[in-house]
Swiss-Prot record:
Record's keyword terms, sorted: Membrane, Stress response, Transmembrane, Transmembrane helix
Extracellular side of membrane: 95-209, 268-274, 328-331, 396-403
Residue ranges of the TM segments: 74-94, 210-230, 247-267, 275-295, 307-327, 332-352, 375-395
UniProt key word Nucleotidyltransferase: no
Molecular function GO labels: signaling receptor activity
Protein name per the record: Heptahelical transmembrane protein ADIPOR3
Length: 403
């Protein structure tokens, strides 16, 4: 009896172990990669990518799959890395705004001025300038300061005697040794004076259009990366993620217009507001259209590509207008060259996306790496990065010249 009971217990253990092994196999098969033909209809998007699909995995496994190999791995990381690139660029740009003078860089003013509170002196100088006959024209000083960016001579109208007059009249209780000040010291002081009054007379232009573009780029890249990571979880989450992805594309295209339009036409408010309003309305309309359920169907791939390409191509109008107004400005030509290059990146990306090249030529050969959507992602990041450099040119141009 005891022996029989022992055999029954042992048999039960073996049966339990076998059940656990089969359950483990079923779990691994369920969370394994499948072929295109095994996908539900809502996940079928590109019939030329044949294998390595994740299909309706639980959310924890979906999140962890960012660090495993499947046919969406590079789609996730190309735009996630792009997001962090633009995050760093945004932080860098925010630290480069020329909004105050570096008082530590002044060479001779602290030696010549008694008990110098340089921040207070900066305000006193600007307030006093209009009272001096030779320096009352603040617009002339602004123009000279702007031209000094590309000139060896700083403030040519501020001669030695005018400088002495400025210091003795505007800072009578601070300035001493006027007759003992050498020409070399006066020249250096002249540069210091220019450095002090420049931020008060020449304010940096608004940065919000540039930050709007950077925000649109980061939103697009992060939304795209998240979409490619999470859409395999369920039909509902795929529905939400795809619309977020399309909204990100529209946001990137729309906000890409903001820097060139605002900085090109900031002195022409009518055209500036007209172009900004048109592209904003077009972007909102595109997002609304993308909410339609049929918009995500595979047969609408070409329509999606044409819609986004047409939205971007509408930027040709303000670019041509800019060239008509500023054909003599090197900055206008420089920014246009960047914009043409950006358009090439985006245009080629849209073409690759719509035609599904190269995987349509060799189905199954580019499942993991090299298929069209990955190339499209790389071209989008390249186009946005090119546009970032165009924006830097606009900022420097308008900071120096204003209207």
């Amino acid at each position: 009896m005891a022996a029989a009971a022992g055999e029954e217990v042992e048999a039960a253990r073996w049966a339990e172990a076998e059940d656990e092994r089969k359950e483990g196999l079923r779990r691994r098969r369920r969370y394994g990669l499948v072929e295109y033909r095994a996908l539900p209809g809502y996940m079928r998007d590109n019939e030329y990518i044949l294998r390595h699909y994740r299909c309706e995995w639980p959310l924890p496994q979906v999140l962890l799959s960012a660090f495993s190999i499947h046919n969406e791995t590079l789609n996730v990381w190309t735009h996630l890395i792009g997001f962090f690139i633009f995050l760093v660029l945004t932080i860098y740009t925010a630290t480069q705004v020329p909004n105050v003078v570096d008082l530590q860089s002044l060479q001779h003013l602290p030696d010549v001025l008694r008990n110098a509170d340089l921040h207070k002196i900066q305000t006193e100088l600007v307030a006093c300038l209009p009272s001096l006959p030779h320096l009352s024209d603040l617009q002339k000083l602004k123009d000279e300061l702007k031209s000094s960016w590309n000139s060896i001579e700083v403030l040519p109208s501020l001669s030695r005697w005018h400088l002495l007059e400025l210091l003795s009249s505007c800072l009578p209780h601070r300035f001493t040794h006027s007759n003992e000040t050498s020409l070399s010291v006066l020249q250096s002081m002249k540069e210091d004076i220019a450095n002090m009054i420049a931020p008060q007379l020449i304010r940096p232009i608004p940065r919000w259009p540039f930050y709007a573009f950077l925000g649109g780029a980061m939103f697009c890249l992060l939304a795209s990366s998240t979409c490619h990571l999470l859409s395999c979880h369920s039909r509902r989450l795929a529905y939400i993620m795809l619309r977020l992805d399309y909204a990100g594309i529209a946001a990137l295209i729309a906000t890409s217009f903001y820097p060139p339009v605002y900085y090109s036409f900031m002195c022409y408010p009518f055209f500036c507001n007209l172009y900004l309003s048109c592209i904003t309305i077009l972007g909102v309309a595109t997002i609304a259209f993308s909410l339609l359920p049929v918009f995500q169907n595979p047969e609408f791939r070409t329509i999606r590509a044409c819609l986004f390409f047409g939205m971007g191509a509408s930027g040709v109008i303000p670019v041509i207008h800019k060239l008509i107004l500023f054909w003599h400005q090197p900055e206008a030509l420089h920014t246009t060259a960047y914009e043409v290059l950006m358009g090439l990146f985006y245009g080629i990306g849209a073409l690759v996306y719509a035609t599904r090249v190269p995987e349509r030529w060799m189905p199954g050969k580019f499942d993991i790496a090299g298929h069209s959507h990955q190339l499209f992602h790389v071209l989008v990041v390249a186009g946005a990065y090119t546009h970032y450099h165009s924006g830097l040119v606009y900022l420097k141009w308008r900071d120096v010249q204003g209207c």
